[in-house]
């Protein structure tokens, strides 16, 4: 806790507020995350509708985000990332409140798509963070913003499970909508408007768009690796609650807590990874990501084979800790390779790639479990991490050759 306070003070009071907004709003959005299959199954008139809607309830908002993130990023560069943050929070609040009153799966899917199209909060928050911190220490900046997201996910999933054990599913969405509306009001009244990016350092402004001349690794290569790592993680998004019920017979709050352990592992490890990678060459970061992908391969393979819930929880936590060294650090390399006036656009593109990869992972997970049963979920995750290992290895070897 002391270290967290010190980091927030080091970045300044505006970042502390930004951290708090990210923590609260993303936690609110994750309150219903692990429980959508239960609600969709209750509302579906047939198994075929459930199979389609069970995918769509996660894919639709991601499609919305992937289709609009680049556009909202350009709008952020033009009109300000602070305004885009407020817009996203209002969109989340309104659609969450509407979803609470939806009583058929098709209305829910339409609203979830609209939710994604109107949202896209994370990319402008990252770009705004670069502005208010002067573009310094991006790895730690993105790591701590991701920590806020994952701490919120941990608390949100657990709180959502508690609410669902006592109240109808609509209560979860109503609570999330009110919280997002509150965050929008706080962002509008409390976050300062950066004066034309004046807070950015000259070094940040002089950064070039491509990192290839100095590292031999393109921005698109980094985005591809991030996408594959995300697809691997998202395979379990839909079947997780059903897997926990079938294999362990767990209650909703245990499912929510287990779901949040991935986020908790990330929270604990991400700042450590950020300090480890601070000032390091991209080739070092990629080399570590080769080892991280291999570690994820082992952890998920063991998690899928155990029937002891204690060991499963420990492995899920370990998996999250390994993931702390992936997306934030790779994203910081992308940001550092981008001119200051294009931060919104490029981070919006990164968000589009991440959401697209998440969609692929979700569809792959649902297709595999529908075809082969829930037992196929973890082997698929393990296989995708094997592929991630090979991609990271290729990028690392290319970076080493470039240095020579």
From Swiss-Prot:
InterPro entries: MFS, MFS_dom, MFS_MdtG_subfamily, MFS_trans_sf
Assigned keywords, A-Z: Cell inner membrane, Cell membrane, Membrane, Plasmid, Transmembrane, Transmembrane helix, Transport
Segments crossing the lipid bilayer: 11-31, 49-69, 89-109, 151-171, 178-198, 211-231, 253-273, 284-304, 311-331, 346-366, 377-397
GO cellular component, one term: plasma membrane
Organism: Sinorhizobium fredii (strain NBRC 101917 / NGR234)
Subcellular compartments: Cell inner membrane
Protein's membrane topology: Multi-pass membrane protein
Family, similarity comment: Belongs to the major facilitator superfamily.
Gene3D superfamilies from the UniProt entry: MFS general substrate transporter like domains
Pfam families: MFS_1 (PF07690)
Protein name: Uncharacterized MFS-type transporter y4xM
Lineage of the organism: Bacteria, Pseudomonadati, Pseudomonadota, Alphaproteobacteria, Hyphomicrobiales
Single GO MF descriptor: transmembrane transporter activity
């Amino acid at each position: 806790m002391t270290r967290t306070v010190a980091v927030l003070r080091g970045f300044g009071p505006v970042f502390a507020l930004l951290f708090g907004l990210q923590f609260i709003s993303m936690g609110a959005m994750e309150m219903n995350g692990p429980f959508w299959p239960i609600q969709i199954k209750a509302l579906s008139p047939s198994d075929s509708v459930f199979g389609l809607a069970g995918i769509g309830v996660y894919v639709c908002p991601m499609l919305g985000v992937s289709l609009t993130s680049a556009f909202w990023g350009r709008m952020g560069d033009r009109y300000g990332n602070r305004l885009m943050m407020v817009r996203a929070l209002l969109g989340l609040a309104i659609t969450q409140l509407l979803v609470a009153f939806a009583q058929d799966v098709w209305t829910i899917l339409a609203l979830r798509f609209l939710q994604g199209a109107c949202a896209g909060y994370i990319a402008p928050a990252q770009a705004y963070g670069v502005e208010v911190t002067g573009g310094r220490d991006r790895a730690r900046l993105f790591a701590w913003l991701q920590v806020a997201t994952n701490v919120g996910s941990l608390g949100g999933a657990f709180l959502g499970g508690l609410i669902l054990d006592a109240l109808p599913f609509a209560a979860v969405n109503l609570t999330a909508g009110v919280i997002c509306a509150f965050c929008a009001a706080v962002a509008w009244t409390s976050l300062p408007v950066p004066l034309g990016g004046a807070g950015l350092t000259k070094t940040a402004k002089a950064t070039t768009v491509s990192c290839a001349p100095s590292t031999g690794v393109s921005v698109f290569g980094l985005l591809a690796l991030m996408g594959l790592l995300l697809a691997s993680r998202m395979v379990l998004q839909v079947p997780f609650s059903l897997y926990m019920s079938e294999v362990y017979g767990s209650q909703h709050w245990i499912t929510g807590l287990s779901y949040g352990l991935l986020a908790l592992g990330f929270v604990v490890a991400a700042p450590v990874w950020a300090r480890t990678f601070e000032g390091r060459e991209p080739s070092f970061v990629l080399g570590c990501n080769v080892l991280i992908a291999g570690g994820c391969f082992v952890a998920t393979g063991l998690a899928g084979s155990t029937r002891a819930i204690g060991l499963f929880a420990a492995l899920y936590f370990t998996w999250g800790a390994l993931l702390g060294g992936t997306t934030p650090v790779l994203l910081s390399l992308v940001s550092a390779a981008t001119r200051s006036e294009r931060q919104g656009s490029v981070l919006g593109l990164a968000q589009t790639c991440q959401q697209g990869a998440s969609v692929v992972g979700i569809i792959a997970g649902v297709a595999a479990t529908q075809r082969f049963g829930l037992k196929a979920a973890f082997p698929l995750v393990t296989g995708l991490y094997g592929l991630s290992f090979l991609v990271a290895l290729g990028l690392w070897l290319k970076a080493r050759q470039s240095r020579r």
